[in-house]
Design a protein with these regions (language model features):
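Active-site proximal loop and beta-alpha junction motif in alpha/beta enzyme cores
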Residues: 2-92, 98-306
Length: 306
């Protein structure tokens, strides 16, 4: 890019109704120009190989857990989307998709009465976002779980410093995103920070081709978050192999949580120590899908000059 091709990018706090909570995502709208700004040259097309190192450099400079890049496709509300952490491109990111939808509606690129269809750059998955009841709703395919056993399970538990004296309620791997899910009692969940070993978690994830590890416990509606919302389950998500030791709110992990808990509806709190977020989940059994919804706030608008 050159100084003559100034591009606006945004920072959005996703899965929260208050600023400086939830998960912050960068959003860069490329090749659209609905409000007069443009993203030409090497970022004009999502399928141009020259875009990859540039997008990676931008994501590293923005230095949020994920940055989303979007391009207007055929149809008034269809967009290509790609996601980058500061170190690597990833196939899917729920909170960055939520953030991108918030930006496109907010800047008038798509009327708020219309749904937005995103097509991911890796894997070609289609994600539909719509405004319902003031929140952004996304629909994912249902996940399916496989039990993790034997040596793989032992290595995974060891990465958290757990041995036979810690009661683990279940160890699974989701097929949708290749995430581990560890279900534990609430008292074990509350002590997670005492036993984390990010180097070992990264080694296990890389050895077995896993994106990240979900650790979850029931909350039973006793906890309240984000302005008085009663919470049913809690979770945390660890993905050091993607350059993110712990992701604050991981929307794409909730279909995996839904497959484990098997509740028709629930409210999940992703309980990051510094940035908590709330995700509402509904299983759409007739269509074999899982819907997640949440709030989002645009906290800054910036100009990319180089």
């Amino acid at each position: 890019m050159t100084p003559s091709s100034i591009t606006t990018y945004y920072v959005v706090d996703a899965f929260t109704s208050v600023p400086f909570a939830g998960n912050a995502a960068g959003v860069m709208v490329c090749g659209g120009g609905e409000t007069g700004d443009t993203c030409l040259g090497p970022l004009a097309r999502p399928d141009d190989p020259a875009t990859l190192p540039i997008m990676q450099q931008v994501a590293a400079e923005v230095n949020l857990s994920e940055t989303a890049f979007t391009w207007k496709a055929a149809g008034s509300a269809e967009y290509a989307i790609r996601y980058f952490t500061p170190t690597v491109e990833i196939a899917l990111c729920g909170h960055a998709t939520l953030a991108a939808a918030k930006v496109l509606w907010g800047r008038g690129a798509v009327p708020s009465s219309e749904a937005i269809v995103f097509r991911t750059g890796v894997g070609g998955q289609e994600l539909r976002c719509a405004l319902e009841g003031g929140r952004i709703k996304m629909v994912f395919p249902d996940d399916q779980l496989d039990a993790v056993e034997g040596e793989e399970k032992a290595e995974l538990l060891s990465a958290f410093g757990w041995s036979g004296d810690v009661r683990v309620l279940g160890a699974y791997k989701g097929r949708l995103n290749q995430d581990y899910l560890l279900a534990v009692p609430e008292e074990v969940f509350s002590r997670l920070d005492r036993c984390l070993n990010m180097q070992k978690i990264q080694e296990v994830n890389e050895k077995y081709g896993v994106r990240g590890v979900i650790v979850t416990a029931r909350a039973g509606g006793r906890e309240v978050a984000d302005g008085g919302v009663a919470v049913d389950i809690k979770s945390r998500f660890f993905c050091p192999n993607a350059g993110i030791p712990e992701d604050p709110v991981t929307g794409s992990s909730f279909p995996t949580l839904a497959a484990f808990y098997k509740m028709s509806k629930f409210v999940g709190l992703q309980d990051h120590p510094r940035r908590k977020g709330v995700v509402r989940v509904e299983r759409l059994e007739e269509s074999g899908q899982t819907a997640i919804s949440g709030d989002a706030i645009i906290v800054s608008r910036n100009e990319w000059l180089v």
